[in-house]
């Protein structure tokens, strides 16, 4: 499988992250105790040269399955994890969760669930237009500075806010 390069930062230095050109989405790994299903799928994708897995805290047991699989295979150093946060919780689906505090919480929970100390890519799964872009980007940058995240992204944002975030990030 071919690779593409994503730029990131690690320990204050620019890095290049070589990601397979096909991302394995892990939304199907939502069930608890799903390693009988998830393990062979993850193994096959990895054997084909795939190395990047897309997951999210909101995907319930997906992060747990990927973390357990990496732990069983001892392959964390060969895996690229893209996870997402900032999604409303199921119990309060109408309450936005894109705040500096929720970003930190989601990354912390994801790292624990994935059994790792960092993710290569972290994206916000939603937006909260009631929160200014600046504090959101500052929170994301802090996670990069702290080494918990190497590159950041956005999902489901309106174009003007994406432009503002990009200008803030440059």
Task: Enumerate the language-model features and the residues they cover.
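Active-site beta-loop-alpha junctions enriched in small/polar residues
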Residues: 27-29, 56-58, 84-88, 124-127, ...
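Structural motif corresponding to the early beta-alpha repeats
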Residues: 73-101
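Generic hydrophobic/packing signal
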Residues: 70, 83-85, 89, 107, ...
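A generic structural signal for short coil/turn motifs at secondary-structure boundaries
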Residues: 30-33, 90-93, 131
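Short charge-dense sequence patches
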Residues: 14-21, 51-61, 86-95, 111-114, ...
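N-terminal binding-site loop/beta-alpha segment at the start of enzyme catalytic domains
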Residues: 1-80
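Short acidic capping loops at alpha-helix termini that bridge into adjacent secondary structure
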Residues: 20-21, 74-79, 83, 117-121, ...
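Glycine/proline-rich, positively charged
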Residues: 43, 47, 94-170
């Amino acid at each position: 499988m071919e690779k593409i390069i994503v730029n990131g930062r690690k320990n204050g230095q620019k890095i290049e992250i070589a990601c397979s050109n096909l991302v394995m989405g892990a939304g199907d790994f939502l069930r608890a105790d799903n390693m009988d299903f998830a393990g062979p799928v993850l193994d096959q994708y990895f054997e084909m040269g795939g190395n990047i897995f897309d997951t999210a805290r909101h995907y319930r047991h997906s992060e747990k399955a990927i973390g357990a699989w990496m732990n069983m295979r001892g392959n964390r150093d060969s895996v690229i994890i893209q996870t997402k946060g900032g999604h409303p919780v199921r119990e309060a689906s109408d309450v936005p969760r894109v705040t500096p505090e929720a970003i930190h919480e989601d990354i912390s929970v994801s790292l624990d669930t994935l059994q790792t100390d960092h993710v290569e890519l972290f994206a916000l799964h939603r937006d909260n237009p009631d929160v200014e872009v600046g504090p959101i980007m500052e929170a994301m940058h802090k996670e990069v500075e702290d080494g918990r995240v190497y590159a950041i992204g956005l999902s489901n944002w309106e174009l003007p806010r994406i432009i503002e975030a990009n200008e803030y990030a440059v």
